[in-house]
UniProtKB/Swiss-Prot annotation:
Homodimer. InterPro entries: LexA, LexA-like, LexA/Signal_pep-like_sf, LexA_DNA-bd_dom, LexA_repressor, Peptidase_S24_LexA, Peptidase_S24_S26A/B/C, WH-like_DNA-bd_sf. One of its GO terms (biological process) is SOS response. Its EC number is 3.4.21.88. This is LexA repressor. The keyword DNA-binding applies. The record marks 83-84 as: Cleavage. It catalyses: Hydrolysis of Ala-|-Gly bond in repressor LexA. Transmembrane segments: none annotated. Belongs to the peptidase S24 family.
């Protein structure tokens, strides 16, 4: 494991938090501004040191050309989610897809294998890989990954005006709307759909 100076660790932490918040790495100028460096060149020197130690990879010629090693193996592919387990639990990961997380915006934290045709009319088909950004912050109309009790589902999100009821809307008339009463249901938002990958037709 690489050993970092305090300042290098601060730069690395900033890169990670910026990617998590925005989906892409910071520029040299943004790093310099947030950490109080005199210039972007000072940030560049810290980035080069981090790259030498293997903490990051630098992509030449790009203002945001910074990659974290953990993103290089690709995005975790989640198959069936075992009841009660966190989505990214090791036993749920079937594989890694060789697509950089920042291919999507916001960045994808995992790919979820779609089961069924309830979202057909939104262009999401059985067997598709849904790119998901881990967040609990969603708005009406977003396509979300939601957990109800121990079941995980992909639906369009709608919060009723009373704020006590959530509707999860299918995009296929053959499927029923799921209505969730937040006062007595174990419900959570696991993530936001940010794209799909279709491996075969």
């Amino acid at each position: 494991m690489y050993k970092l100076t305090t300042r290098q660790q601060e730069v690395l932490d900033l890169i990670k938090s910026h990617i998590e918040d925005t989906g892409y790495p910071p520029t040299r100028a943004e790093i310099a501004n947030q950490l109080g460096f005199r210039s972007a060149n000072a940030a560049e020197e810290h980035l080069k040191a981090l790259a030498r130690k293997g903490a990051i990879e630098m992509v030449p010629g790009a203002s945001r050309g910074i990659r974290l090693p953990e993103t290089i193996q690709g995005i975790p592919l989640i198959g069936r989610v075992a009841a009660g387990n966190p989505i990214l639990a090791e036993q749920n990961i079937e594989d890694y897809c060789d697509v950089p997380p920042d291919f999507f915006y916001p960045q994808a934290n995992y790919l979820l294998k779609v089961q069924g045709m309830s979202m057909r009319d939104a262009g999401i088909l059985d067997g598709d890989l849904l790119a998901v950004h881990s967040t609990t912050q969603v708005k009406n109309g977003d396509i979300v990954v939601a957990r109800i009790e121990d079941e995980v589902t992909v639906k369009r999100f709608k919060r009723e005006r009373n704020n006590a009821t959530i509707q999860l809307l299918p995009e296929n008339p053959d499927f029923n709307i799921i209505e969730v009463d937040l006062r007595d249901a174990n419900f959570s938002i696991e993530g936001l759909s940010v794209g799909i990958i279709r491996r075969e037709l």
